[in-house]
């Protein structure tokens, strides 16, 4: 039994190929069914986001498992197998476990430490579980991964520091003015940077938002999407008079906001302070507005310093999380190794209990007048003797779980105690690796 992950991400393939290798939300259930019916694959989870497509599988053999996962991707996406091979990164065993933990904690994301991937993996796992394509191994592995990611974000500040200019603009606004719920915010521009700023503003509680753009239709579309209002470019000066925060991001080659304009506006504002954040290149705001009292003006260079400092803090937090990951990998591998030992220990205990029961039956026949108290005393001492005799063999069996030759050593262990048939019987009566749809469902809130 082996854990395999086949990954297509921003490091292995360009966006034009990643677009072709993406599962639509409506197709994943069907894809899971097709995946689990491939040869060699015992359990499966599919993760598909805008930046990565990953297939996690428990396989009976490493080489055949890798082959059939890639073959499945080739058939599903109608892409030749050589393209799949060149566009994928394959990890097996401990490396596959480490990869999942690294991805779910945000350490493999374009934005270091982002938290969205945690929810995406959680949803992918729960869907696979509901479809019956996970079992003993993945139910444990993904539960551990989700718990680890929550702990990593709770115990470090890796996701709390802005590492994009648009997000930094919003964080700077909060630092200067505090909560944004009652602040009047003006967005000048309707491009990608402006939209990212809007997303973060709304996420930070801002509700009073005005959008201005040279193209009114774009401004209205963006304003409607985020619950704001749109005004024309001709109303810019009126909007500046009313605003507490201005974030500007246009493609203009000239200043949109000039020093003379702001001198007039500040008089009408009755000396109320104004925060100007210019995230455009070239700049939208004349840097000479810095000479005007009560104007706090910041450009991309100011924000870049904040972003660089925050990124350095995230990287320090990442090192802490890597230590958490290493420990969790060891813990999970120990658990995996114990799966093969448990039937052996169970068989040994059951054999000892049968010997005890047979011996007690013999005592009862030969000493029929024993009182109930005497029987309990004898039984108690027999259990004590059995536990003492089994203590060292069981301890040795657990030690074997970490050995590279554990299969051979466990077989030798079974032969010494003559429990090979009992072990096979226990294995045959265990639940299948892959569970049914009605099996236990992991609750991620527990």
Swiss-Prot record:
Residue sites binding substrate per the record = 49-52, 109, 114-116, 120
Molecular function terms from GO: glutamyl-tRNA reductase activity; NADP binding
The residues annotated as site (Important for activity) are 99
Return the InterPro entries for the record.
Answer: 4pyrrol_synth_GluRdtase, 4pyrrol_synth_GluRdtase_dimer, 4pyrrol_synth_GluRdtase_N, GluRdtase_CS, GluRdtase_dimer_dom_sf, GluRdtase_N_sf, NAD(P)-bd_dom_sf, Shikm_DH/Glu-tRNA_Rdtase
Q: Which UniProt keywords apply?
A: NADP, Oxidoreductase, Porphyrin biosynthesis
Q: Does the keyword Protein biosynthesis apply?
A: no
This protein's pathway reads: Porphyrin-containing compound metabolism; protoporphyrin-IX biosynthesis; 5-aminolevulinate from L-glutamyl-tRNA(Glu): step 1/2
Give the matching Pfam families: GlutR_dimer, GlutR_N, Shikimate_DH
Catalytic activity as recorded in UniProt: (S)-4-amino-5-oxopentanoate + tRNA(Glu) + NADP(+) = L-glutamyl-tRNA(Glu) + NADPH + H(+)
Please state which protein family the record places this protein in.
Belongs to the glutamyl-tRNA reductase family.
Description of its domains? Possesses an unusual extended V-shaped dimeric structure with each monomer consisting of three distinct domains arranged along a curved 'spinal' alpha-helix. The N-terminal catalytic domain specifically recognizes the glutamate moiety of the substrate. The second domain is the NADPH-binding domain, and the third C-terminal domain is responsible for dimerization.
PANTHER family from the UniProt entry: GLUTAMYL-TRNA REDUCTASE 1, CHLOROPLASTIC (PTHR43120:SF1)
> What is the recorded function of this protein according to its Swiss-Prot or TrEMBL entry?
Catalyzes the NADPH-dependent reduction of glutamyl-tRNA(Glu) to glutamate 1-semialdehyde (GSA).
**Subunit structure, interactors included:** Homodimer.
Q: What else is known?
A: During catalysis, the active site Cys acts as a nucleophile attacking the alpha-carbonyl group of tRNA-bound glutamate with the formation of a thioester intermediate between enzyme and glutamate, and the concomitant release of tRNA(Glu). The thioester intermediate is finally reduced by direct hydride transfer from NADPH, to form the product GSA.
Q: What is this protein called in UniProt?
A: Glutamyl-tRNA reductase
Could you tell me which species this protein originates from?
Macrococcus caseolyticus (strain JCSC5402) (Macrococcoides caseolyticum)
